[in-house]
Swiss-Prot record:
Pfam families: ATP-synt_B. Disulfide bonds: none annotated. The chain crosses the membrane at residues 7-27. This is ATP synthase subunit b. It comes from the Bacteria. The gene is atpF. One of its GO terms (cellular component) is proton-transporting ATP synthase complex. The keyword Transmembrane applies. It comes from Actinobacillus pleuropneumoniae serotype 3 (strain JL03). HAMAP family: ATP_synth_b_bprime.
Length: 156
């Protein structure tokens, strides 16, 4: 009988232990486990939200970079266009100036040629008169001399 009383005593002690654990030990353990589960769920949700925000931020940053590149390309294209316009304008002005200088040079050469030609005609006429005076042996009067020179210049 002793064996049965020990067994019943152990059963009562075990039942008291289980009741004590269910009353005082299990609730804090369950509460701690549930809090831990909630913290893990919140952390996972926060991580997922942060991951989504990071993806959105990256997409927005990529979009801004693309806009900046497009704007930079527009500025470069505009600057290139403006540079080409300025070059064409300067080249056109230089061509006009070159033509003006060439025409001015031609005009100066032509006027110098006419002046030299006139000077040469007068010298030839003077030489012709001097030669005629030597041949004739006398001097022709100045009025007749001028008439002869004018006719000779006109013929040359």
């Amino acid at each position: 009988m002793n064996l049965n009383a020990t067994l019943i005593g152990q059963l009562i002690a075990f039942a008291l232990f289980v009741a004590f654990c269910m009353k005082f030990v299990w609730p804090p353990l369950i509460k701690a486990i549930e809090e831990r589960q909630a913290n893990i769920a919140n952390a996972l949700a926060s991580a997922e939200k942060a991951k989504q925000e990071q993806a959105d931020s990256k997409a927005a940053a990529d979009q801004e970079i693309l806009k900046a590149k497009e704007e930079a390309q527009k500025i470069i294209d505009l600057a290139t266009k403006r540079r080409n316009e300025i070059l064409e304008s300067v080249q056109a002005e230089a061509e006009i100036e070159r033509q003006r200088i060439i025409e001015q040079g031609h005009a100066e050469v032509e006027s110098e040629r006419k002046r030299v030609q006139e000077e040469l005609r007068q010298k030839v006429a003077a030489l012709a008169v001097a030669g005629a005076e030597k041949i004739v042996g006398r001097s022709v009067d100045q009025a007749a001399n001028n008439d002869i020179i004018d006719k000779l210049v006109a013929e040359l």
